[in-house]
Amino acid sequence: EIDISFKTPSSDFKNFLAVIPETYSKNIENVKTTGNFVVEGEFNGVVDEEHIPKFNIKINSENASFKYPDLPKSVRNVFIDTEIINKSGIVEDTRVDIERLSFMIDEDKFNMNAKISELMGNTKVDAHIDGRMNLANIEKAYPVPPGLNLKGLLVADVNTAFDMNSIEKKQYANTKTNGNLKLSDFEYKSEEIPNPVKLKTTQMTFNPKTVTLNELSGSTGKTDFSATGTINNLLGFMFND
């Protein structure tokens, strides 16, 4: 039988950067941070062939910020309010509640909330993402892989709800996605893709059963392209092996 409780020894937001693999966070020793980051939780119960300990892990950050010394911009207004919970001791009953995940770079803001249940079984997802982000500012505030060049303005407001059994059985009537996404003056270039992919305008409308591509125009290398159309069963397309 297990009965354990824990809490991060300090509330310094640098604790959050420390849990990100160094490949993505780089050297954090000289990163300037403000605000807090706290992880606390408890495990209790029996462990046998059918059970794991019951647990409740809370992850919280309020109005935090961080700035890398060699980059011109900071990530600020960081809010994290997340719980990872299992009340039964049955592994399939594990769920994640992301009540709030948000941050700002300059005046651009990203927001997300989600509920993910039956994490190790028939995973169910109910999520909302909205925000406006100048993608060029990402590399000005956070270390990105060498050779990566990302530009464009992304505006999105999308809701999605689905379960994995419905996706696997192609029962797309049980899924729901709606909202809008617009991407303008997008450019992507990396070491793997040396010829930039450019999208002058992309507008998509998400409906419960279809995605309407209202406008798409761009170029790659010396090739120009444009398109409009409809995608049926987007989630099935995304998760198709």
Where would I find each of the regions flagged by the language model?
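Membrane-proximal interfacial segments on either side of biological membranes
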Residues: 1-97, 101, 108-211, 223-241
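Acidic/polar loop patches that form or flank catalytic/metal-binding clefts of enzymes
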Residues: 214
